[in-house]
């Protein structure tokens, strides 16, 4: 390891020593070289250590992978951004829209336009995470299709059936709403590719990039315990032999992917060059694709200075020392984060097994010392 990033590794070690999380793995790429750091254990009270190649549940860091997979299919003509989504998702045909976000479910009007592939890519199709207790929020939770760190416990067809029975919160194309569009995109990609999503992902992304540790489940002997913060300390969210230890019914790139830090670093490194996508599709994916009205939904969740490309956040301002306009990345609710800063020439990836306490929790304990080191 170089001395340059020693302060970063010390900061991460201090975080683990404090009991914040049992362990973590990080990677930094700068100046054409990559360094990794692993510390702590995979499960509290057990000796198994974190390793550089330890697999993690990466939650919403699967979304940029979905964006890249979709961009690949757009590049070869399998999809086009303005295709109606109901070509592959007939359950989305003729949607109804609530007269207001908090209206009763029966108070709807027809959608003013079709839902398109672009709407799913940019999370503007009209439905997603709802942070207020509205009739639609309650109905999504009761149906088992509300955003959650654990993927839907049903087949994609059943997910689509349940979702089709509910109205949209907003007119398609008018507002950014988190997550649900990513699950819909996952179903669409599998249907458009005429195969299981795992197979299409392997053919187009993980196979060519040698991402052997990335998939929809992992060996329970290698998988860390996932924890969430509770009133008396860390509580188990998912055990090593839990949900992510076997093939799921729903293969979701919105929140169901398992990966390693080196694999994810390989993905982002390829995304920065020409190894994964043609320049045009890469530019669309990693640049601002929202208008001012759509962006209001994103600003409510993450604040100003950030917009959205194809399944990934993009910086329109550089509001922290490690950020810059044109930078892109995202976080995962299970405690993962990744960011690419093309102007400063670095990529950072950090995987932990501790669930984020909320959308405002950050990873500044990693990014701040990294910015200082650079």
Model features per residue range: what roles?
Residues 35-37, 338-341, 345-354:
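Short, well-ordered beta-strand elements
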Residues 86-95:
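Acidic helix-start/capping segments at beta-turn-to-alpha-helix junctions
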Residues 36, 95-325:
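Short, surface-exposed loop or secondary-structure junction motifs
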Residues 273, 286-297, 357-374:
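Short, gly/Ser/Thr-rich active-site loops of penicillin-recognizing serine hydrolases
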Residues 2-58, 78-80, 97-106, 364, ...:
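Short, conserved catalytic-motif segment at the N-terminal edge
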Residues 249-256, 327-339, 352-358:
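Glycine-rich phosphate/pyrophosphate-binding beta-alpha loops
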Residues 6-13, 32, 57-85, 182-190, ...:
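Active-site SXXK
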Residues 22-24, 56, 196, 334-337:
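Short loop/turn microsegments at loop-to-beta-strand junctions
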